Amino acid sequence: MALDATQKEKLAALLAQEHVAVLVTQGDKWPTANLQAFAETPEFDLLFIMGGNADKYQNLLKHPEATVLVDNRDVGKIPTFEIVRAWMQGIASDVARGSAEWESLKAIFLKKNPFEEPFFKNDGLRMIRIRPSRVSYASGLRDTFKAEL
């Protein structure tokens, strides 16, 4: 089932509101979860930057399947679980540094996260684009949906 217009709006609103997500990658033995800044494209592709020597980057090169969790627990009502959250699963790909795609996605990333600008001066910086294929969304306990993208 694909996302309908209302579901797209809900997912887009959550992604636009949040600046950090939990990126889960599969290592040789253990999964690894990292909280870090992200940005999203209008098509819901998720963008992350990281060092080329980071475990998460190396994990994604070997095992490109990734899960990303985005939520608003910082402003949600924890006692009643009124938290908007979504996990997205997809395939990660490396964005070639210096390419037109890199420059285009860098602009999207920095528009959302201008505080990340200094990292782009590091020659070891890498950018990953995750093209989601599945999403599970919930706002509280009743407003939920799952979809294939």
Go through the PLM ranges and name each one.
Residues 2, 81-149:
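Charged, gly/pro-rich active-site loop segments
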Residues 4-9, 56, 111-114:
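Charged, amphipathic alpha-helical segments
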Residues 18-52, 60, 68-72, 79-80:
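Short beta-strand segments
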Residues 22-26, 76, 114-122:
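Short helix-to-loop capping/linker segments positioned immediately adjacent to catalytic or ligand/cofactor-binding
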Residues 1-21:
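Extreme N-terminal tail/first-helix region
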Residues 51-54, 69-75, 106-116:
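Short acidic (Asp/Glu) patches
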Residues 57-63, 80, 147-149:
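A short, polar/proline- and glycine-enriched secondary-structure boundary/capping micro-motif
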Residues 17-18, 63, 133:
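Structured helix-beta-strand junction loops
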